[in-house]
Amino acid sequence: EVIEEDGTKRFVYLLDETLELDHVGLISTNMAELLVKGITELSYRECATKVSEMTGQTISAMGVWNVIQALGEKVYNEEATLTEEYKKGHVKGEKEVPVLFEEADGVYIKLQGKDRKKEKQDKAEIKIGIAYDGWRKTGPERYALENKVVVAGFSKAKEFQEYREAVIAQEFNLDEVSQRILNAEGASWIKKVKDKSTCFQLDPFHRNKAVKEKIHERTAREAVLELLREEEIEEVFRY
């Protein structure tokens, strides 16, 4: 039993306190981590069964859902705090670079159980953002991004862009960035960036997809794609 400064009492497990273990309700951090890893690949019911077998601690599908919701709420509050600190000008990274490369995309994933009912749909878009200041070759046809920052979330466009900016600002001093290049597929939410000087660039996959959708004549389509592959941009316009 522990008595807090305000006089309230709480009970703790001394070993967990010594090891600085946190809890989500009655669930230990270790078990919560197993649930998070499991739920990315399994249904709530399958995750509950798998984790119960692995740990010897019984948890129901509803129990898994409750833990994920609690963790989600905690993450949401942390993200909101970071965003507010950024808006106040309190977030400024140490890395100073002249050019910042960015990517953004949306991926639809299927929802489960209560999540499906809550959203009144069977899938939702998770927005993804990446920022980095360069790349290096790691092998034949393989490259690794330098100082990569990754952001993901289900929030609306405005909220996501504000949080994305805050996360990037933790790593980079955005006041010192002269040019920001955003490589994306052209969705409307992607264009709602905070820095209006951002240069938008359609990535090769979505560029080629747009050509195939807009140019129906096969010969003309293949000719344009070939010119693009050869980076003959002026020839594309003349064609």
Regions found by a protein language model. Give the residues of each.
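Catalytic center-proximal scaffold of phosphoryl-transfer enzymes
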Residues: 3-239
